[in-house]
Regions:
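Rhodanese-like catalytic fold shared by cysteine-dependent sulfurtransferases
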Residues: 1-25, 32-71, 80-118
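Short, surface-exposed ligand- or partner-binding patches at beta-edge/loop junctions that are enriched
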Residues: 75
Length: 118
C-alpha cells in the first residue's frame, strides 16, 4: 500500500505474476506514443490511455476489464497515472485492482531492460 492509499504491487511481484501464467489483466494506461518506447509484451496486456479513459469513462474500458471482481494490475510510466486509475476503478466498484509501483520504468530498471525506457 502506498501513501496514496491505493493497493500496489512491486515490479518484482508483477514479474512473478507474468511468469506464473495466472489469470489477470495488465492494464497499461499510458498514451499511444509512449508504447513506442517501452512495452511489456504479454497476451494479458490491454491498453487504454488515461486521456481516453477520462473522455469516455467506463465505456472506454476493454471487455476484459469489465469484470469488477477480476484481477487488474494497472501500469503506467512511473506509477502516478496507474495509482489514479486504480483509485478511479475502486471508487466505481472494482474490487481486485492494484497499481504497479514504479511503472514500466521501474520494471525496465529492475526486471527486464529489453522492455525499453524513456
Amino acid at each position: 500500500m502506498k501513501n496514496s492509499g491505493v493497493p500496489e504491487i512491486s515490479v518484482h511481484e508483477l514479474a512473478d505474476k507474468l511468469n506464473s501464467g495466472g489469470s489477470f489483466v495488465l492494464l497499461d494506461v499510458r498514451e499511444a506514443w509512449e508504447l513506442d518506447y517501452a512495452m511489456i509484451v504479454d497476451s494479458r496486456l490491454k491498453v487504454i490511455p488515461t486521456s481516453r479513459l477520462a473522455q469516455l469513462r467506463e465505456k472506454a474500458l476493454p471487455e476484459e476489464v469489465q469484470d469488477k471482481d477480476g484481477e487488474i494490475l494497472v501500469i503506467c510510466h512511473t506509477g502516478v497515472r496507474s495509482a489514479q486509475v486504480t483509485h478511479w476503478l475502486l471508487t466505481r466498484g472494482w474490487t481486485n485492482v492494484a497499481s504497479v509501483r514504479g511503472g514500466i520504468d521501474g520494471y525496465a530498471k529492475q526486471i527486464d531492460a529489453s522492455v525499453g525506457k524513456y
